[in-house]
Design a protein with these regions (language model features):
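Short, solvent-exposed secondary-structure boundary/capping segments
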Residues: 75-86
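Short, ordered loop/turn segments at secondary-structure junctions
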Residues: 32, 72-74, 120
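Short, conserved beta-turn/loop elements at beta-strand boundaries and strand-helix junctions
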Residues: 64-65, 71-77
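Short, well-ordered loop/turn sites that connect or cap secondary structure elements
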Residues: 52-54, 59-60, 109
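Helix-rich interaction surfaces within compact, conserved domain-sized segments
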Residues: 89-120
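Short, structured beta-strand/loop micro-motifs enriched in basic residues and often containing a Trp
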Residues: 37-48, 91-101
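N-terminal disorder-to-order initiation segments that are Gly/Lys/Arg-biased
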Residues: 1-40, 113-114
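Conserved "cap/hinge" positions at secondary-structure junctions
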Residues: 62-63, 119
Length: 120
């Protein structure tokens, strides 16, 4: 499997953990891309989207792996433009910038944690 997109957490907004606890979701955004959103997002290093993320790909988050089950119609574009997408863990959504995932529980999110999408 080839790595399609890989970034590391640089900052965690105060509301970002709350979103994970209450909505099983994480909002990702390039570090410094939108300072007014910093409280709500997990900021990360800038990364290059080498190929589009598609259903069947794998997200590795620390040592935990998740299967991509849906990719919103705008998710790859927003990742490419500003590292932005919303990850939904073991739940469904309908927004165009969301990526749905299934797998085990989400590990603790900390600065330095790596997010890596891989696939064919």
């Amino acid at each position: 499997m080839a790595v399609k997109y890989e970034v590391s957490v640089t900052a965690i907004g105060k509301l970002a953990r709350k979103f994970l606890e209450t909505n099983s979701s994480i909002i990702l955004l390039d570090e410094g891309a939108h300072p007014n959103l910093a409280e709500m997002v997990i900021e990360h290093t800038s990364g290059e989207l080498n190929r589009d993320i598609i259903v069947g790909d794998t997200l590795t988050l620390g040592k935990q792996k998740y299967k991509v089950t849906r990719v919103g119609e705008n998710a790859n574009d927003t990742i490419h433009d500003s590292g932005h997408c919303t990850l939904l863990f073991n739940t469904t959504g309908s927004m165009p910038g969301q990526i749905e995932l299934e797998g085990g529980p989400v590990p603790p999110i900390s600065v330095g944690l790596k997010f890596s999408f891989s696939g064919k």
